């Protein structure tokens, strides 16, 4: 399951929910699309997920309506939970442009600079308007006294190329970030 957003407060008398998007693809939130709601940390516990169907989504207001949630009381039960969508459904509904990737496809890729593997991507975080690759450093570099985990901004200055077929991200200047972490 992929995190689409975080559900905020209930809005109005018809069960509206404020949605704080975690996705770059709001076009996936269409009427009739199946989504799941669960605590944000429920990734490993499938029984925590409760399924819903989107009734409507107002992108300008970040307002989500689910088909079976029609009262403020029912909406409040979902406050502070995560809104999830299956990976297959996300990939079916979201059309990527050249150079765009799903976060889930980048997790696990090796981070390489020159001929040296620096580590692998274990998570992607968005801080302000910038995405950061959280990289778990290779054991050999950690044994040399470098940080176990470091962040690389997803910027041209650091990221040369993302090669999904080779399962790697080539970088430049990223080792400097590691050395200064």
UniProtKB/Swiss-Prot annotation:
Key words of the record: Chaperone, Cytoplasm, Ribosome biogenesis, rRNA processing
KW rRNA processing (keyword) present: yes
GO biological process: ribosomal small subunit biogenesis; rRNA processing
Intracellular or extracellular location(s): Cytoplasm
Complex formation: Binds ribosomal protein uS19.
Comment block on domains: The PRC barrel domain binds ribosomal protein uS19.
Described function: An accessory protein needed during the final step in the assembly of 30S ribosomal subunit, possibly for assembly of the head region. Essential for efficient processing of 16S rRNA. May be needed both before and after RbfA during the maturation of 16S rRNA. It has affinity for free ribosomal 30S subunits but not for 70S ribosomes.
Protein name, entry field: Ribosome maturation factor RimM
